[in-house]
């Protein structure tokens, strides 16, 4: 930056001593030192912020590259799945139709109108709605015994009281 040697610094100090005088020189030197320190801290903060921004920019570019690679992988997988689905639909249509390719060229029924493959509509029969509140069957007692399922549940306090030895029990008081 500035080429200040020892001789130039001594010259500046002598001029400041003559101009300011011995009484005000220490106060001015303290003020100048404080201002110089503030300037250095400000410059260091700016440098740190610039380096942080550069790192963030690098991270952003890495993130976009990673997202692009993930999108490419996803698109490749979807393309492969669509291709296999097309092959399966063609095989299904040729196997299901009695005429072979004639039925595949002119599909009829609900799958042709909705645009869905025929194997989806045939396999996916409308499911009955069940009422989850109504219990349809009871688990047999023999099954509960065989699988050692608890049929009568006790609280922890009742279980402790049941297995406590008689010597440790409190005497029962009746009026």
Curated annotation (Swiss-Prot):
**Disordered as annotated region, ranges:** 94-118, 153-175
One GO-annotated biological process of the protein: protein transport by the Tat complex
Q: Which InterPro entries match?
A: TatA/B/E (IPR003369), TatB (IPR018448)
Composition skew (Low complexity), residue ranges: 94-115
Q: Name one GO molecular function term.
A: protein transmembrane transporter activity
As for subcellular location, the record says: Cell inner membrane
What is one cellular component GO term in this UniProt entry? TAT protein transport complex
Keywords attached to this entry: Cell inner membrane, Cell membrane, Membrane, Protein transport, Translocation, Transmembrane, Transmembrane helix, Transport
| Membrane association type | Single-pass membrane protein
Residues spanning the membrane: 1-21
Task: Please give the superkingdom of this protein's source.
Answer: Bacteria
Q: Which Gene3D superfamilies match?
A: 1.20.5.3310
Checking Pfam families in the record gives:
TatA_B_E
Basic residues bias (residue ranges): 160-175
What is its quaternary makeup?
A: The Tat system comprises two distinct complexes: a TatABC complex, containing multiple copies of TatA, TatB and TatC subunits, and a separate TatA complex, containing only TatA subunits. Substrates initially bind to the TatABC complex, which probably triggers association of the separate TatA complex to form the active translocon.
Q: What does this protein do?
A: Part of the twin-arginine translocation (Tat) system that transports large folded proteins containing a characteristic twin-arginine motif in their signal peptide across membranes. Together with TatC, TatB is part of a receptor directly interacting with Tat signal peptides. TatB may form an oligomeric binding site that transiently accommodates folded Tat precursor proteins before their translocation.
> Which family does the similarity line name?
Belongs to the TatB family.
NCBIfam families, alphabetized: tatB (TIGR01410)
Write the protein's name. Answer: Sec-independent protein translocase protein TatB
- What organism, scientifically named, is this protein from? Burkholderia pseudomallei (strain K96243)
The record lists the lineage as:
Bacteria, Pseudomonadati, Pseudomonadota, Betaproteobacteria, Burkholderiales
Gene of this entry: tatB
